[in-house]
Curated annotation (Swiss-Prot):
The gene is metE. Keywords: Amino-acid biosynthesis, Metal-binding, Methionine biosynthesis, Methyltransferase, Repeat, Transferase, Zinc. L-methionine binds at residues 422-424, 475, 590. This is 5-methyltetrahydropteroyltriglutamate--homocysteine methyltransferase. The active site is at residue 685. Binds 1 zinc ion per subunit. It catalyses: 5-methyltetrahydropteroyltri-L-glutamate + L-homocysteine = tetrahydropteroyltri-L-glutamate + L-methionine. Pathway: Amino-acid biosynthesis; L-methionine biosynthesis via de novo pathway; L-methionine from L-homocysteine (MetE route): step 1/1. Catalyzes the transfer of a methyl group from 5-methyltetrahydrofolate to homocysteine resulting in methionine formation.
Length: 744
């Protein structure tokens, strides 16, 4: 019998967002590459020491990144598309991430069903993988020096890497054959450094179609096993499904399973677990922020102990999806804080559970956790009115009063290629400082609102001057599209230091749903009315949809996600009604996170999509026929959920298509999407400024797929992260491109 502890990755942004600040300073040429790397390494080394101090025995290392871990492996393998090969070193790396001088960046998409985004490798016939592992080997050497034998290198497996790549005129098997010798070479070098075990992260195994690659998995692992290192095969986010029986036979020494999601426990009971392997028992949920329920988890571990002799207790995945330390959240009510668990607390829970399994735990620690939960349930807000409203919902509450074509006749007529933006305009340091000063009490409400209104006036004047057709107020009062609404809803709370990485230098603070959700007052009406009073042109009301609010929050675990989504939908529904009363003829209900909530296995999609679509419709069905309802979705693959997208019954959908080579546009066309579409004609995540000619070409491509009457012209996402000197010429060129096409 062997009981141990492991980790599979750790937050890498710095407790005070040091990496973000360093990246932005480097991009602005305020610090050197050496200074940037020094800061990132200090954060990385601090995380190793934190895990060591907590008592973790085998610590996953090598997951720290300047931007994205998949981009790192693309770079190490020399999988660099031709358009970036003119650049060298970090200039090339960041050009791939962000674009440069008009060159499109790599496509960005969701990391499985999380809110993290990775950069999609592009593998084309002209690319021959050629490895340079020097940075990774340097990391391993540092880790060995600091934490010794506890260091276990984390490597993205070749099959997951290829599975997540875009293959253009190349065969999966051919690329695998080219990559495997490079992987074997890396493992050989690690062995020479004295490494005895590696983690090979294989999340692609949880996809429902992974059995189609059974031969490739078996061949790859047989080849890598020849090196003679202990291979710890790591899966997460779902169960192995039908792959379980043959995965258990792969030549590895450990297999990690996520026991917080899916049916892995049932698979173990049905098929057993090989006695010659260690089970990495992912029992501490790496993706939520709630403390363990000790009785449930210890019972699960005791059950596993009766089946499997060698167990490593660990988080279910990398801890990059949770903040660092809940003890810093001194503003949260104690009853709530006591049942929250961030990365450092999850390390403590991992060690506590390991001790409980060996009979060495402190009984009072376990009892205290249960007492905390009892106190929390007394504190958590309940709203009987909301519960009653949900019980009383009727079919008509989910349906607009007219069909799309009937509504179209009632709505404001606009010129061909109508122009708009997705909502936000640049959030400068001055704007962020303004909100911070107001929160600290350094400004009165009147002083704060006067400055917000000045920003709105500037934004409206700017758009009018460009000739934009449907304006937005700019969202200067909003630090985040979820946080802004959550702060005004009962049942939500927010952290002060709870930052997690969304992509690159973009960090977010997901709110926490801890009780029933209710809208006590209007949330967006004042700013809308200010903006609309400044122009004769229509201004869009801007709301975040219920499914995105849910998927970008840490949800409750005591009631279903569906019920939480419906509570949110009722709140958004009331806000939409108030926007109409204030004169809004265009209202956007953003759902960028609709697809990311999908279960990873397709057979479970139907249930999720049913209630997700219903939640959106519940929030928008109350709109009058003359109100044009827009929605926005980004970083999503729509082809396989197109019927659900159509069922949303939005009048206009704007999408992220600028990095996707018109794939999403083709999918909409193939599905005979009936409503209007804003394809997203340029990439806002790149600092490059698109020319009018480039944007004209983008629109010409759109015309190949959609009739002119269906096309809107907009950027692919909000402009919040751009600077004014980037946003102004880009949007002006966009409007000019649309106007020039009208004149043809």
């Amino acid at each position: 019998m062997s009981i141990s502890t492991s980790t599979l990755g750790y937050p890498r942004i710095g407790k005070n967002r040091e990496v973000k600040k360093a990246l932005e300073s480097f991009w602005q040429q305020k610090i050197s590459a050496d200074e940037l790397l020094k800061i990132v390494r200090e954060i990385e080394e601090a995380s190793w020491q934190t895990q060591t101090k907590a008592g973790i025995e085998r610590i996953g290392i090598g997951d720290a990144t300047l931007y994205d871990q998949i981009l790192d492996w693309s770079f190490r393998f020399g999988i660099i598309p031709k358009r970036f090969q003119q650049f060298q070193n970090l200039e090339c790396y960041f050009a791939m991430a962000r674009g440069k001088d008009g060159i499109l960046a790599l496509e960005m998409t969701k990391w499985f069903d999380t809110n993290y985004h990775y950069l999609v490798p592009e593998i084309t016939p002209d690319i021959t993988p050629k490895a340079d592992f020097s940075d990774f080997l340097e990391t391993v050497k540092r880790a060995k020096k600091i934490i010794g034998k506890s260091a276990v290198p984390i490597i993205i497996s070749p099959i997951t890497f290829i599975r997540l790549s875009r293959l253009e005129s190349v065969e999966f098997d051919n690329i695998l054959a080219q990559l495997l010798p490079l992987y074997s070479d890396l493992l050989t070098k690690l062995k020479k450094l004295g490494i005895s075990e590696i983690q090979l992260h294989e999340p692609a195994l949880v996809f429902g179609d992974s059995s189609n690659l059974k031969k490739q998995f078996e061949m790859a692992y047989a080849e890598l096993a020849k090196v003679g290192l202990n291979i710890h095969l790591v899966t997460y986010f779902d169960d192995l499904g039908e792959t379980y029986p043959w995965v258990m036979k792969l030549p590895v020494t450990s297999i990690s399973l996520d026991l917080t999601r899916g049916q892995n426990l049932e698979l173990i009971k049905s098929y057993g677990f090989p006695a010659d392997k260690t089970l990495g028992a992912g029992v501490v949920d790496a993706r939520n922020i709630w403390r363990i329920r000790t009785q449930e988890v210890t019972s699960l571990l005791e059950e596993l102990k009766g089946i499997i002799p060698n167990i490593s207790v660990q988080p279910s995945a990398s801890l990059q999806f949770v903040p660092y330390d809940v003890r810093r959240e001194v503003k949260l009510p104690e009853a709530l804080r006591n049942v929250l668990s961030f990365a450092e607390q999850k390390l403590e829970e991992t060690v506590l559970l390991s001790k409980a399994l060996t009979g060495k735990s402190n009984k009072s620690e376990i009892e205290n956790i249960e007492i905390y939960w009892q106190e929390f349930y007394k504190f958590s807000p309940a709203n009987e009115k909301v519960k009653s409203q949900i019980k009383a919902l009727k079919e008509t509450d989910f349906r607009r009063s007219m069909s799309y074509l009937e509504r179209l006749d009632n709505q404001i007529k606009l010129p061909a290629f109508p122009t708009t933006t997705i909502g936000s305009f640049p959030q400068t340091k001055q704007v962020r400082k303004l909100r911070a000063r107001y929160k600290k009490g350094e400004l009165t409400q009147a002083e704060y609102l006067a400055q917000i209104d000045a920003n709105i006036a500037y934004c409206i004047g700017l758009q009018e001057g460009m000739g934009m057709d449907v304006l937005v107020h700019g969202e200067f009062e909003r630090s985040d599209m979820v946080e802004y609404f959550g702060e005004q809803l009962d049942g939500y709370t927010f952290t002060t230091h709870g930052w997690v990485q969304s992509y690159g230098s973009r960090y977010v603070r997901p709110p926490i749903i801890f009780g029933d959700i209710y809208r006590p007052h209007a949330m967006t009406i004042r700013e809308f009315e200010v903006a609309q009073s400044l122009t004769e042109k229509p201004v869009k009301g801007m709301l975040t949809g219920p499914v995105t609010m849910l998927n970008w929050s840490y949800p409750r675990t005591d009631i279903s996600r569906q019920e939480q989504a419906f509570q949110l939908a009722l709140a958004i529904r009331e806000e939409l009604k108030d926007l109409e009363k204030a004169g809004a003829a265009f209202i956007q209900v953003d759902e960028p996170a609709m697809r990311e909530g999908l279960p990873l296995k397709q057979q479970r999609w139907h249930e999720y999509l049913n209630w997700a679509v219903d939640a959106f419709r519940l929030s928008t069905a109350i709109a009058r026929p003359e109100t044009q309802v827009h929605t926005h979705m980004c970083y999503s693959e729509f082809g396989d959920i197109m019927e659900s997208i159509k069922q949303l019954d939005a009048d206009v959908i704007s999408i992220e298509d600028s990095r996707s080579n018109n794939e999403t546009l083709m999918q909409l066309t193939d599905a005979d999407y009936p409503a209007q579409v804003g394809p997203g004609v340029y990439d806002v995540h790149s600092p490059s400024i698109p020319t009018t000619e480039y944007l004209r070409e983008s629109l010409y491509k759109c015309i190949q797929y959609l009739p002119v009457t269906q096309i809107w012209v907009n950027p692919d996402c909000g402009l919040k992260t751009r600077r004014w000197e980037e946003a102004i010429p880009a949007t002006r060129n966009m409007v000019q491109a649309a106007i020039s096409l009208r004149q043809e």
